[in-house]
Amino acid sequence: MTHPNIDLVMKLYGAFMTGDDETIGSALSPDITWHSSGTDPTAGDHHGIPAVLAYLGADDHMDDYSLDVVDMLASDTRVAIIAKASGRRGDARFTNEFVQVVELRDGVVTEVWNYNWDQAGLADFMSVPI
């Protein structure tokens, strides 16, 4: 049996992979803040559901996108995810390992922190014209 917070995060990852913004939006607090480390064009703090959905939509501009969850650890208020994402933009291909910490309250996501392993490589990759 998995922790209910892991179930919620896995549901969100599935919705992200299928582009289901309705499911994603329904699981986010209206005052969510999503922190993305680094210097790539999508880095920074994204406040509110519309801004978070726009941030997540940046990955729509990749081909052959995949997301592999390595492990998840959960408590009653947080889920920590170790994962690897890869994709292609034009002729450029990139694989990014990252840690994500998701904070939950009352069954919705209130805050997220992304920590990318290769921030410089991600910045170069996300700057490739599409």
Feature-to-residue mapping (PLM):
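A beta-strand edge to alpha-helix "cap/lid" segment located at domain peripheries
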Residues: M1, L53-I130
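Short, low-complexity N-terminal intrinsically disordered segments enriched in polar/charged residues
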Residues: M1-P30, V128-I130
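Residues at secondary-structure transition points
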Residues: H3, A43-H47, R93
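A short, structure-level motif marking secondary-structure boundaries and short turns
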Residues: N5-I6, P41, K84
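Hydrophobic pocket/interface hotspot
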Residues: V9-L12, T23-L28, I32, G48, ...
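Short, flexible active-site loop motifs that bind/organize anionic cofactors or intermediates
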Residues: K11-G14, T42, M62, V112
